Amino acid sequence: QLSAKDTFTPINDPNKLPKSALELWQGYDARAEDLEVNTIEEWKTDEVTTRYLTYKVGRFKGANSRVSAYYSFPNKPGKYPAFVWSHGGGQRAEKNRSVYFAKQGFANIDINWLGRPVKEDIDTNTDWGKVDPTQGPRFYSKALRKGWKVNLQPDEFSIDPIPSPRNSNWILLSMAGRRAITFLEKQPE
């Protein structure tokens, strides 16, 4: 069931599918939806502040998709260069990595797109809702598929009900990264 607030309207007509990378992202504004940031935990040292948080990637099939992340920044007042760290497959976001980069003078957000448990034993984590760009239950306990989706065919956990480039896992993962940039843009550091 489609909610009026879904990030994308499903495409049912093959003639309306995007035919280029530009068309694929046409009409998508990563700043349009509220990030709905929830700070779960915060740690401070003399040098760095780190927050474990979740933010909204989008709304798909009537359910919100949220990604957890570590956001770290130097405590010294000022504006800092910032970047998104997106871990490799089978890995997870790591607090120590985020702290390391903050100590080097960078604000950074280390996103936990795969949803593997974090080392701090915090229960709140990535929740993709009714879509699933993950690598399956071996890595993500809330996985909706048995494994990594490697095609553009539709299933009950993809965006479009017809073969579509928007059914690629990489669309949702790219959105998670782009929304992390939106998060960084809104920070005072």
Predicted feature locations:
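Active-site loop signature of alpha/beta-hydrolase-fold enzymes
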Residues: 91-92, 116
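N-terminal pre-domain segments of enzymes
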Residues: 2-39
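N-terminal cap/lid segment of alpha/beta-hydrolase-fold proteins
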Residues: 26-78
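Alpha/beta-hydrolase fold nucleophile elbow
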Residues: 188-189
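Cap/lid segment of the alpha/beta-hydrolase catalytic domain
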Residues: 99-175, 183-185
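Short beta-strand element of the alpha/beta-hydrolase
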Residues: 68-71, 78-88, 108
